Each structure stands twice: as C-alpha cells, then as structure tokens.
C-alpha cells in the first residue's frame, strides 16, 4: 500500500463532506439570480413597484449617486420611468452570481429606435432579498472604435 493512500482517502472524505454545502450554495445563487431577474423585470419593464417590493429586504441601500436611497427612492424612480420613458425596455444579456452578489449585463433602451445603454448592475442579497444596488451606465456610441459590440 502506498504511503500516499491515507492522504488521498482523507482528501476524498473532506471533499465529499463539503459537497452538500456546495450544492446548497449553488441553489441559493440560482435562487438569487431568479430573484434579481424578476425584480429587474418588475422595475424596468413592468414599472410596477408592488411587484418589485416583494424582492426587497428590510433595507435597500442605493449606491448610484443620482438615485434616492431606500424603497421610497425606488418607488420614485419607477414613477419617473412611467412618466418620462413609458416604453423603456431592459434586456438582461448575462447574469452572474457570486455568493450573495448578483451581477447583470443589460441592454436598456429608453426610447424605441435608439441605441440605448449598456448597463452593469450589481445587487447584494441577504436571505434571498435585495438589500443593496450599484450600477454603471455606458451609452452605446453611434460609431464605436471597434466592431466587437457591447453585448
């Protein structure tokens, strides 16, 4: 018997013991992605605060310096969209989860027929509810310096 066998056996036991936790983490990350996607659709496409509010935690910290903080700030943003950009549409192109963080790469078009913006939104979740938000918005240029596309 090789002297490395006990080490290999121990490593296998440790990995097997960790596996249920990894599966639970993977499920939570998938659930977080689903919650963020539904929240995103409720806010930006449906413009429905009540539908969006069920995805919010006990607090909602907004890190966008141009947006008001908390659920009332979100409610005001949705009212602004309804009034100024009723045809606004946002399409999630990519969605990633890393623990309690979900990142979306989005093509947002406020007015039909325009190029729109490329957006990266980052959400932090606690117990499956959204508690923080960051974003970066980049207009899609008429004449980009390359042909790679933004999505």
Task: Please state what every model-predicted region is.
Residues 1-8:
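Bacterial N-terminal signal peptides that target proteins for export
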Residues 9-11, 21:
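Cleavable N-terminal signal peptides
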Residues 19-151:
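C-terminal and inter-domain tail/linker signature
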